[in-house]
C-alpha cells in the first residue's frame, strides 16, 4: 500500500512539472498577438511621403493592400540583384517587418532602419521607393544598409 502511494505521488509530481512548463494555446496566441501589435504600431511618423507611410503600414500589418501601392510589375532589387516583386513578397508579407525606422531621405521615399527578415534574422536595411507619374511605385530597391 505504501509503495502504491509513493508511486502515485511520484507520478503526480512528475506530471505537474511537465504541465507547468508548457504554454497553453491561449498563452501562445497572446504572445503572437503582442508581437503582431508591436509590428503594427511601430513608429512611422518619420516617414514624410504619405504613400510610402501607407505602404509601410500595410507591410507591417502583413496586409495585401501592400500590393496596391505598386504598378502591375514593379522592378525590384535586393542588394542590387533583380528579383521578382510578387514572388518575393508572397514569401515575406506577414513574416517580415521593420522593427524601427531610423532615418528617412529623398523626400520620404528612402527608409533606413532595423528589419526582422524572419529566418534570415534582424539587420539594418534600406527600402527605396520610386514613383511613376501616376503616383504608384514602379520600383523598389531594398538591401542591407552599410
Regions found by a protein language model. Give the residues of each.
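Short beta-strand edge/turn micro-motifs at domain boundaries
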Residues: 122-146
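Mature extracytoplasmic domains of secretory-pathway proteins
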Residues: 72-79, 84, 94-95
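Short, well-ordered alpha-helical segments enriched in acidic and aromatic residues
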Residues: 51, 61-77
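Surface-exposed, charged secondary-structure patches
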Residues: 86-130
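Bacterial Sec-dependent N-terminal signal peptides
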Residues: 1-31
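Short, low-complexity N-terminal intrinsically disordered segments enriched in polar/charged residues
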Residues: 20-61
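Hydrophobic/anchoring residues in structured secondary elements
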Residues: 76, 103-106, 142
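Acidic surface patches and DE-rich sequence motifs
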Residues: 70-71, 78, 117, 132
Amino acid at each position: 500500500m505504501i509503495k502504491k502511494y509513493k508511486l502515485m505521488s511520484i507520478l503526480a509530481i512528475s506530471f505537474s512539472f511537465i504541465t507547468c512548463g508548457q504554454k497553453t494555446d491561449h498563452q501562445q496566441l497572446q504572445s503572437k498577438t503582442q508581437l503582431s501589435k508591436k509590428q503594427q504600431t511601430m513608429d512611422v511618423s518619420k516617414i514624410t511621403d504619405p504613400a510610402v507611410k501607407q505602404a509601410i503600414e500595410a507591410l507591417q500589418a502583413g496586409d495585401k493592400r501592400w500590393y496596391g501601392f505598386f504598378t502591375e510589375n514593379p522592378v525590384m532589387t535586393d542588394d542590387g540583384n533583380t528579383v521578382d516583386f510578387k514572388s518575393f513578397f508572397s514569401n515575406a508579407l506577414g513574416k517580415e517587418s521593420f522593427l524601427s525606422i531610423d532615418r528617412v531621405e529623398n523626400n520620404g521615399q528612402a527608409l533606413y532602419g532595423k528589419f526582422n527578415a524572419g529566418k534570415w534574422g534582424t539587420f539594418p536595411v534600406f527600402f527605396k521607393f520610386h514613383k511613376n507619374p501616376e503616383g504608384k511605385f514602379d520600383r523598389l530597391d531594398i538591401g542591407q544598409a552599410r
